[in-house]
């Protein structure tokens, strides 16, 4: 699998996760779309729902990769960024 195919697959997974969060949390927290903005209760509910969804996702991901929940998956060390000079 080349780099482009991996990036496409990663974007599909992210999109699927986002859609799952959107479906689950909007169905749970938003009963009617009467206003342009969420009220306080809807906003708090949605925030908690997304937080729980992400915590669950991290736990499942750590189980699948074989790491402990607080442990980070080792990644490649980032290349040293070139020194920036001036405004840009």
From Swiss-Prot:
One example of a Gene Ontology biological process annotation: protein insertion into mitochondrial inner membrane
Residue runs in coiled coils: none
Region called Disordered, residue ranges: 63-88
Tree of life domain: Eukaryota
Organism: Dictyostelium discoideum (Social amoeba)
Protein transport listed as a keyword: yes
Name of this chain's protein: Mitochondrial import inner membrane translocase subunit Tim10
Biased composition (Low complexity): 68-81
Purpose: Component of the TIM22 complex, a complex that mediates the import and insertion of multi-pass transmembrane proteins into the mitochondrial inner membrane. The TIM22 complex forms a twin-pore translocase that uses the membrane potential as external driving force.
